């Protein structure tokens, strides 16, 4: 059976909490769009986690977590989250990242804060 959690608003709807509850029995959990500006807090046996990039499925050994091609992937945020789950000894992380993601790096977020666009040269 396929289950989808889709927001009808701009956030703060409880999607992360519902996704975490469903992830306990899921084979695959996919984050299909969005950026690191949104997030959800997960509290479990490993500790308290604020996830902005990783799907909730990372805490379940039977679940594959997928970061899909609609995600604006903030690399420093992803690395921080990966380091946090490793440091808290979350076992058996199965994570797949689409090769079609838009990768954001530090210079992208800095230019956005300054109100400037980044362009290729």
Language-model segments: residues:
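Non-transmembrane, aqueous-exposed alpha-helical and coiled segments at domain scale
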Residues: 1-121
């Amino acid at each position: 059976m396929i289950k989808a959690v889709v927001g009808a608003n701009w956030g703060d709807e409880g999607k992360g909490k519902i996704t975490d509850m469903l992830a306990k029995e899921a084979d695959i959990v996919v984050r299909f769009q969005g950026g690191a500006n949104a997030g959800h807090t997960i509290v479990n046996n490993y500790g308290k986690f604020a996830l902005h990039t990783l799907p909730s499925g990372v805490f379940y050994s039977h679940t594959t977590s997928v970061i899909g091609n609609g995600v604006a992937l903030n690399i420093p945020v992803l690395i921080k989250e990966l380091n946090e789950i490793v440091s808290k000894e979350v076992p058996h992380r199965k994570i797949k990242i689409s090769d079609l993601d838009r990768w954001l790096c530090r210079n992208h977020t800095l230019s956005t804060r300054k109100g400037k666009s980044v362009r290729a040269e």
